[in-house]
């Protein structure tokens, strides 16, 4: 009956207008305007399809996702965004580096996804190895030493170049096609 007059309700406290919120998108933080989205997307970001389905060089292999090679499994077996950018950046350094060469790993529980980059006669293979897979660097290494989580291994090995037309072997000195080094003796007179 003898109530005290309530103070006027205070306005809802607003979040601090920081550098990354109020100054850039004052009207909506989480949903920037269309113009802001267009300005932010001026730099081309390649999609997964652009990176993983380039025109393959001759002799390129396949890519196996999933336990037995099912495509479309972009879970743990998918490479990270950093790896995709690295594959894109290293893919344009030469004719044979036009695209990352993707090879299938062993099927079954010894599955391994690999990214392979051609570098001259050598290949750098960055493999995501499941914890139950033995190390390709030391096959005698016990499986338990790889730990519980997936490991990153970089393997260097020599590989033959892409098969192509074989260049003819040059003739060595002293072959039949070479000019004679001295004049033959005259035939005997009868």
Swiss-Prot record:
Basic residues bias (residue ranges): 36-46
Biased composition annotated in UniProt, kind: Pro residues: 1-15, 162-171, 181-190
Region feature Disordered, mapped onto this chain: 1-110, 160-190
Protein name, entry field: Protein E6C
